[in-house]
Amino acid sequence: MNPLKAGDIAPKFSLPDQDGEQVNLTDFQGQRVLVYFYPKAMTPGCTVQACGLRDNMDELKKAGVDVLGISTDKPEKLSRFAEKELLNFTLLSDEDHQVCEQFGVWGEKSFMGKTYDGIHRISFLIDADGKIEHVFDDFKTSNHHDVVLNWLKEHA
């Protein structure tokens, strides 16, 4: 696993959202976007992380940042997740983990003694020109939003 770094050009992608509509990274050209990768919708850690972003969306918008969450869940599951948690941002389905691999977040993980391939919880702030401005890879699900907002304030 080799995640992209600040300064790299973000891979262009097109993925279905929670409503089955195609969303392209190029739709956000001229804007900053936080692309956050998370392992699985409707699980405890991922729910805490998503709700933290939801509850701080006004602050993120003030900083000029849109949010896209990416997992390998099917759009139908993402739709249920968004409805259940009243999420106010777009969730994208990368079922074949191609985009995860392009960003370098797909790789070997271990949980309770088992080793498997999956998504590593990493977020990328992409600038208005499509370049990775910052990589967030050191946070807890409960403070992800704080880590992002603090970085945005320090680099305003």
From Swiss-Prot:
InterPro entries assigned to the protein according to its UniProt record, in alphabetical order: AhpC/TSA, Peroxiredoxin_AhpC-typ, Peroxiredoxin_BCP/PrxQ, Thioredoxin-like_sf, Thioredoxin_domain
Active-site residues, record numbering mapped to chain: C46
Origin superkingdom: Bacteria
Record-linked Pfam families: AhpC-TSA (PF00578)
Keywords, ordered alphabetically: Antioxidant, Disulfide bond, Oxidoreductase, Peroxidase, Redox-active center
Residues covered by the Thioredoxin domain: 4-156
GO MF annotation list: hydroperoxide reductase activity; thioredoxin peroxidase activity
EC code: 1.11.1.24
Catalysed reactions listed for this entry: a hydroperoxide + [thioredoxin]-dithiol = an alcohol + [thioredoxin]-disulfide + H2O
Gene3D superfamilies in the cross-refs: Glutaredoxin (3.40.30.10)
Intrachain disulfide bonds: C46-C51
Enzyme superclass (EC): oxidoreductase
PROSITE patterns referenced in this protein's UniProt entry, alphabetically: THIOREDOXIN_2
Gene Ontology biological-process entries: cell redox homeostasis; cellular response to oxidative stress; response to oxidative stress
Assembly and oligomerization: Monomer.
Protein purpose: Thiol-specific peroxidase that catalyzes the reduction of hydrogen peroxide and organic hydroperoxides to water and alcohols, respectively. Plays a role in cell protection against oxidative stress by detoxifying peroxides and as sensor of hydrogen peroxide-mediated signaling events.
Miscellaneous field: The active site is a conserved redox-active cysteine residue, the peroxidatic cysteine (C(P)), which makes the nucleophilic attack on the peroxide substrate. The peroxide oxidizes the C(P)-SH to cysteine sulfenic acid (C(P)-SOH), which then reacts with another cysteine residue, the resolving cysteine (C(R)), to form a disulfide bridge. The disulfide is subsequently reduced by an appropriate electron donor to complete the catalytic cycle. In this atypical 2-Cys peroxiredoxin, C(R) is present in the same subunit to form an intramolecular disulfide.
UniProt record similarity statement: Belongs to the peroxiredoxin family. BCP/PrxQ subfamily.
Entry protein name: Peroxiredoxin Bcp
Source organism (scientific name): Escherichia coli (strain K12)
